[in-house]
Amino acid sequence: MALQISKEDTQVLLKDKNVLIEPTIEKYRTAGQIAQTALNFLISLINKMYHEKSMEPLPIHQLCLLTDSFIADCLSTKFNNKVNEKGISMPTCIDIDEINENWCPEVDDIENLSRWNQKSRSTKSIELCNGVTSSLSGFLKVGDVAKITLGCHIDGYTCNVSHTVVIYPTVQDAQSGKLLPEAALLGGKADALAATHIAVESVTNLLAAANDLTKLPADFNATKVTGSLIRTVVDTIAQSYNCCVVPGSRIRRIKRFLSGQNENIIVERDFKGVIWTESHQEAAMLARTVNETAVDVKRKNPFITEDTVVPTDDFTVVKGEVYMIDLKLAPLQGLEPGLITLHTVDQFSGKSESSDVVARPGAICRDFSKSHVLKLRAARQVLTRLDKQGVYPTKLAHIADSFPLDVQEPDFETIKQEIKPFRLGLSEISNNYLTIDRDVTIVKHVPWAKILDLTNPSGVSSYDAMAKNKGLYPGFELPLPKLGLSNLQLKSLLKKHSTPVPVVRQCVTVAICDEELLRISGNLKSNWVHSVYSMDTASNIVAGIFKLAQLSEDKRFGLKIRETQPWKMKF
């Protein structure tokens, strides 16, 4: 369904409203302050429960709901009667180890998760992966790597943030008597944490260099910041630390109400960003194994415009743009050469494989391109409440009358009772495709030896919404287009020959202003880790990365980067 609007409205909505003037920057800055304050609030709760042990641990679903309530309370104090919309842009998610994203169960799903997964058993992995076990139990364990993701928006100007927290074993200090981490994190998880932190910092510095191209190091052999240069920098860092960029990672430009939350619904014609998919791993594998130097020459068709919906690296970063850096890396330690891909968790029980996890998506997103006359009164009431939430993902708990909860004395039972009638209405809404589920995904590894045994030139799997629905654009219909492996074949391999792999995530939002780069979110310190890997300084790309890091520390002649600080609050 395509919505026809005038050219004047298009100019206002997509151009004028995204100019980085002072009121717009202030909305981004305020959203960043609230997001970072909420992140500090949740991290402080986790530290008190598992490191300081000064309070009883709360289940994951309660931690998520408390953080969402904290964000809603903070938003209620800003821009009142000045903006039409403000709210949560991403429900708080706590994804542990191999769980990739979107783990934010509702308060009424805890008993269901235990019942649905009674027969599930843990699978072997390269390193201890307790993500599924910890998530089903609802509590974190020592050694878990928890990825916290949340976000908010003010008038459509969005700030999402992700940070990874490590649950350390603690020992009591002899002098102070406080509980301190026993030792640094080692192994593959430490490699991924170090690589992710360095990659995000390097890309941030690279985007800051777009303000003053004279400070772009000559080692990159580039005169401007392009998508291909960004991909090269991230891939170089990942390879140096023996890691792989997980499919779905992205560095993309965001606009008002367009922060990548509806990529399966909305087709963005003016898309700018770097996207990592399985096909990039396939191309890298073939480049290493096939002794060919031939290069495919793509001739430009004069009858085809540059207006495309397929993500490409052929773009240039310029001033006045806002970018979201969302990187997820998985370690390759102890793995044979293979493919890192995503396995979607669904809510269908009665599967033949007892190791399959059954979970219902907690986050849903309203598809405003579809309409339907609903029969149930409960469905119409739920749809009315969902329409008020806007285009961003939400939860049933967010539309309850008792939300937001009192952070000091939360009443989870009341909101649990309110959600029960919403379930009936949501069933009819989702059956008529008025909402889209934000599926929970798990990162898994499949050996190339098993993949090469299969081939099938059919199947549809794409990143882009239009290509996914219409089967357009050769190369994007298949996860592995050159090998001809279909999506169904890949799913069969995931059931028989896959291994769960831990993943680390970090997401920040930056704005390239006229004189400086404004770091809207993501200035938290990295975890205490020790990695056995380091980057090769003989490489030109690595040398350029180090020079950018030095320029970022030079406050006088270096890169001009300003950070948005969270609110000073005692938790």
UniProtKB/Swiss-Prot annotation:
Complex and partners: Component of the nucleoplasmic and cytoplasmic pre-60S ribosomal particles.
Record function comment: Probable metalloprotease involved in proper assembly of pre-ribosomal particles during the biogenesis of the 60S ribosomal subunit. Accompanies the pre-60S particles to the cytoplasm.
Entry EC number(s): 3.-.-.-
Record's protein name: Probable metalloprotease ARX1
Keyword terms, alphabetized: Cytoplasm, Hydrolase, Metal-binding, Metalloprotease, Nucleus, Protease
Similarity remark: Belongs to the peptidase M24 family.
GO BP term, pick one: proteolysis
Record field: transmembrane: none
Molecular function via GO: metal ion binding; metallopeptidase activity
Intracellular or extracellular location(s): Cytoplasm; Nucleus
InterPro entries: Creatinase/aminopeptidase-like, PA2G4/ARX1
GO CC term (a single one): cytoplasm
